[in-house]
């Protein structure tokens, strides 16, 4: 299980937006790749959109596998692939009032 949260590193909040139609297809593709590559039995991925404050949960990845190494490696693969190409953008809202959008 991986749970990603909004960190308190000068950020007051983060806002997430996604191109849902493409993001869902991309997440399904990533799950299929991870299942094949790491022999995973089950995968659940939840990524939130909208305004999230410090310590709020952004992303949850739950994988099931017969062996721990495959589960951990599969979970990491899923996380890195989400960050690499799923169309989800985030806006950092800094405590100083600055705001920055990025992928």
Can you name each region flagged by the protein language model?
Residues 1-57, 64-103:
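N-terminal, polar/charged subdomain of small-to-medium soluble alpha/beta proteins
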């Amino acid at each position: 299980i991986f749970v990603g949260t909004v960190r308190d590193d000068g950020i007051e909040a983060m806002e997430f937006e996604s191109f849902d139609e493409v993001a869902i297809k991309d997440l399904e593709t990533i799950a299929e790749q991870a299942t094949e590559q790491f022999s995973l039995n089950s995968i659940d991925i939840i990524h939130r959109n909208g305004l999230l404050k410090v310590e709020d949960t952004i992303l949850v990845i739950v994988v099931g596998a017969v062996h721990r190494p495959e589960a951990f490696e599969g979970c990491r693969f899923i996380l890195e692939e989400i960050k690499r190409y799923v169309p989800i953008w985030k806006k950092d809202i800094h405590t100083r009032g600055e705001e920055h959008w990025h992928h």
